[in-house]
């Protein structure tokens, strides 16, 4: 967690990606970072992610929220990271994602929800994670 906080502080630009249900979590982190003076671009769709690909550089950080850590979104991010040599953080609830080995930061959160009601039960877990991450950022910035 501390390494992710340090990466956020040292990144030239930060992109936070979350689509569909993960968008809420991505938006929460963006607003929390803004309150601490750290600007971040929120990406909520595939078209936006494709457009941002032209701007991403080696000193940038892409933070991806994805409960399943599988699918088209992560493949697109993976291609960007490979091409642009930027850094990637994956926040997920899937400990067995194929993207584990290619992420600079791979954080697995506990999954509380049932398949029928996972969104309402899992969002509080991610919210607590966001608050802990902000706490680490505060500690680092105060040094």
What are these regions (language model features)?
Residues 9-128, 133-141:
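Glycine-rich phosphate-binding loops that contact phosphosugars or nucleotide phosphates
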């Amino acid at each position: 967690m501390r390494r992710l906080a340090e990466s956020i502080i040292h990144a030239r630009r930060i992109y936070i990606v979350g689509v569909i249900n993960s968008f809420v979590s991505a938006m929460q982190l963006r607003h929390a970072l803004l309150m601490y003076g750290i600007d971040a671009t929120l990406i909520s769709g595939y078209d936006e992610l494709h457009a941002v690909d032209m701007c991403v550089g080696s000193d940038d950080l892409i933070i991806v929220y994805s409960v399943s850590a599988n699918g088209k979104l992560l493949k697109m991010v993976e291609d960007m990271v490979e091409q642009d040599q930027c850094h990637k953080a994956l926040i997920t609830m899937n400990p067995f994602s194929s993207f584990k080995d290619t992420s600079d930061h791979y954080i697995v959160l506990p999954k509380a929800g049932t398949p029928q009601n996972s969104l309402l039960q899992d969002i509080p877990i991610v919210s607590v994670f966001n608050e802990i991450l902000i706490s680490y950022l505060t500690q680092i910035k105060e040094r």
